[in-house]
């Protein structure tokens, strides 16, 4: 019997494991960047709307002195990367597609938010403000030595970078396989995510679209494709925005008697984007009563 493990999405990189034998079919994501691909993102978003939603985003209006790049989180880059994931904002009816877009934007906005309660323009205008985690976190290596297939490199730091704030050596290694066709590039150079806007956005969409057992993909959750099993139901894991939070940061933000303020902002971001796209937020927005996946 064969089991299928997704290394990337949409058959771009697959690993089949059968009777102890492994065969890889790899077509690196970066080789699929063309202008001929299409994405539904442009159906619901324009550059003008992007500027309205993210007026404080990293690098807008100025050139990053380190990377020599203006507007790191540009709408153009987001659309270009979305074309690599043709099922993103493409399955179900318009309401489901807009709900997925709202859920994705809510999570990346909160992951990178520079806002505070009385921030100019309001808290929700400060999404995509940060490129990397705050300085207090960048002293941690985020190297999980139990993940033997993706060994971290001494002196390298796998802290959060990019829209999703990709973290941990095993995530860098898996995404490196999907993007470059090998795990070593980003394990050796995790800082690349802070230098290349395409790579940075791709890391976020790769994470969103890719299931990592025992977690389903955020994409499958929000479009209603993921069906909880009996244990999921017992543990409170139900379809909805809350389960995407569980996938992203369940060990910290879920199953808490009192939600952290950042978790409340994450839920509120989702409602903010749903309102912007004129759709309902659906059921099970919170993960407060959900056990993290794997527990």
Each language-model region and where it sits:
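Bacterial Sec-dependent N-terminal signal peptides
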Residues: 1-22
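Peptidoglycan-targeting cell-wall enzymes and recognition modules
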Residues: 25-80, 89-93, 100-210, 236-240, ...
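Hydrophobic, mid-to-C-terminal alpha-helical segments
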Residues: 218-219, 229, 233-247, 255-266
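Low-complexity, Gly/Ser/Thr/Pro-rich intrinsically disordered linker/tail segments
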Residues: 246-295
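Amphipathic alpha-helical surface "interface" segments used
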Residues: 222-237, 288-295
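GST-like fold's C-terminal all-alpha helical module
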Residues: 206-228, 240-241
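Short, well-ordered loop/turn and helix-capping segments at boundaries between secondary-structure elements
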Residues: 172, 210-214, 276-279
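Surface-exposed patches in mature extracellular/periplasmic domains of secreted proteins
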Residues: 87-101, 117-121, 215-225, 281-287
């Amino acid at each position: 019997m064969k089991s299928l493990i997704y290394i990337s999405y949409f058959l771009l990189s697959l690993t089949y494991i059968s009777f102890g034998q492994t065969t890889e079919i790899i077509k690196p994501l970066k080789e699929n960047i063309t202008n001929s691909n299409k994405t539904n993102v442009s159906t619901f978003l324009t550059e003008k709307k992007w500027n309205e939603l993210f007026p404080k985003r990293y690098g807008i209006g100025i050139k990053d002195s380190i990377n020599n790049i203006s507007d790191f989180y540009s709408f153009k880059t987001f659309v270009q990367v979305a074309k690599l994931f043709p099922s993103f904002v493409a399955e179900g009816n318009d309401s489901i597609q807009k709900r997925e877009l709202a859920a994705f934007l809510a999570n990346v906005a909160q992951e990178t938010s520079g806002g505070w309660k009385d921030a100019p323009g309001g808290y929700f205008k400060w999404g995509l403000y940060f490129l990397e985690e705050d300085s207090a976190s960048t002293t941690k290596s985020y190297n999980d030595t139990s993940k033997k297939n993706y060994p971290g490199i001494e002196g390298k730091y796998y802290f959060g970078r990019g829209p999703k704030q990709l973290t941990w050596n095993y995530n860098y290694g898996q995404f490196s396989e999907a993007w470059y066709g090998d795990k070593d590039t980003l394990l050796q150079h995790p800082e690349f995510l802070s230098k290349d806007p395409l790579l940075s956005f791709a890391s976020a969409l790769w994470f969103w679209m890719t299931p990592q057992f025992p977690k389903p993909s955020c994409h499958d959750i929000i479009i209603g494709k993921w069906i909880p099993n009996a244990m999921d139901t017992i543990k409170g894991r139900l379809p909805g925005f809350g389960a995407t939070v569980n996938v992203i940061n369940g060990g910290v933000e879920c199953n808490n008697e009192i939600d952290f303020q950042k978790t409340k902002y994450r839920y509120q971001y989702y409602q903010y984007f749903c309102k912007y796209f004129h759709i309902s937020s659906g059921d099970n927005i919170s993960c407060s009563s959900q056990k993290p996946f794997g527990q």
